[in-house]
Curated annotation (Swiss-Prot):
The lineage of its organism: Eukaryota, Metazoa, Chordata, Craniata, Vertebrata. It comes from the Eukaryota. PANTHER family: LEUCINE-RICH REPEAT-CONTAINING PROTEIN 34 (PTHR24111), LEUCINE-RICH REPEAT-CONTAINING PROTEIN 73 (PTHR24111:SF3). Residues 286-296 have a biased composition (Low complexity). This is Leucine-rich repeat-containing protein 73. Keywords: Leucine-rich repeat, Repeat. LRR repeats lie at residues 57-78, 86-106, 114-137, 145-166, 174-187, 202-223, 231-250. Residues 257-296 are annotated as: Disordered. Residues 272-281 have a biased composition (Basic and acidic residues).
Length: 316
């Protein structure tokens, strides 16, 4: 039987449901487990963690919106991740981890052989967490390093922390998707990120929605896109104080680059993205403007679901 998905959102989990989830994990019948915003007791959370520790079919685990709500649950999840070898995408958006909680998780994350996508948006992180995250980016032996990283809405991270991340992305990472939306980055940090993008050979998607940018940083990004060949395909600049003219110029240049790649490599290389990340802009009820690589696209690219896409590539 092919592995299936279990997706429950915002509901209290009964004992029977928890038993079914654990049985599916132990039988390796679950490829995607999403318990986004679900409510369950500590005992049942521990049962699920013990079951997912040995699951070999589980590729994506979504515990967004407060499921991992205490230090004891963080420790239980860390213990499960130390044993698990199959999870490629881990979503913890909206979990009150703090730097201390990520320090508990980090050893398991650093040693996990399959993890390529990590969502730590709105997790109350600061600069100490950034130091740990930077260590997850580069390849290490058989590990490929992270390919998708979400750090949306972590205002406790200072410019010093963001500069460290920019250096890590530029130097040795394999990151394709970097979501930094709804952080107070400002023009100075955006300038450092432009240098990182220009240096990176892999970064395809950069989300800077609602990050306090102005025309100053937009001009820097425009110069980068215009004068330096990069892998960048999508740059999200909604909810910033940037003129429509500058936004359109950046968008046009990215679209031109994408068209040239399609002519050279064929349209069959286009990545098919999934949405596993919390749609921060939609939660805030904001209007959205994006700079997509595909001029026919009508919506903001909120996430890539890259771990699942990579699994599909491997199976082909």
């Amino acid at each position: 039987m092919l592995p299936s998905s279990i997706q429950i959102s915002g509901e209290p989990l009964s004992g029977a449901e928890v038993r079914d989830i654990c049985r599916g994990l132990r039988d390796n019948a679950v490829r995607l487990l999403s318990l986004r915003g679900c409510r369950l007791c500590d005992r049942d959370f521990g049962r699920i963690c013990r079951a997912l520790a040995g699951a070999t079919s589980l590729a994506q685990l979504n515990l967004n919106l407060g499921v991992v709500s205490s230090p004891s649950r963080i420790k239980q999840l860390a213990e499960a991740l130390r044993t698990n070898r199959s999870i490629q995408s881990l979503f913890l958006h909206g979990s009150p981890l703090t730097d201390a909680g990520l320090a508990l998780l980090n050893p398991a994350l650093a040693l996990h052989p399959a993890l390529v996508a990590l969502d730590l948006g709105d997790c109350m992180l600061g600069d100490e967490a950034i130091n740990l995250i930077c260590g997850l980016l580069p390849p290490d032996g058989a590990k490929s390093g992270l390919k998708e990283l979400t750090l949306s809405a972590n205002p406790g991270i200072t410019p010093k922390g963001w500069s460290r991340l920019a250096i890590a992305v530029a130097h040795s990472s394999q990151v394709r998707v970097l979501n930094l939306d709804y952080n107070p980055l400002g023009d100075h940090v955006a300038g450092m990120l432009a240098v990182a993008v220009a240096s990176s050979r892999t970064l395809e998607v950069l989300d800077l929605e609602g990050t306090g940018l102005t025309n100053q940083s937009a001009q820097t990004l425009l110069d980068m896109v215009e004068n330096y060949p990069t892998a960048l395909r999508s740059l999200v600049l909604a909810e910033n104080s940037i003129s429509p003219e500058l936004q359109q110029q950046i968008c046009d240049l990215l679209s031109e680059g994408e068209e040239e790649e399609e002519v050279a490599g064929g349209a069959g290389d286009t990545q098919e993205w999934e949405r596993g990340r919390e749609p921060a802009a939609h939660q805030r009820g904001s209007s959205s403007w994006m700079c997509p690589s595909d001029p026919s696209s009508q919506m903001v690219l909120m996430t890539s679901g890259l771990g699942d896409s990579l699994l599909a590539e491997t199976e082909m």
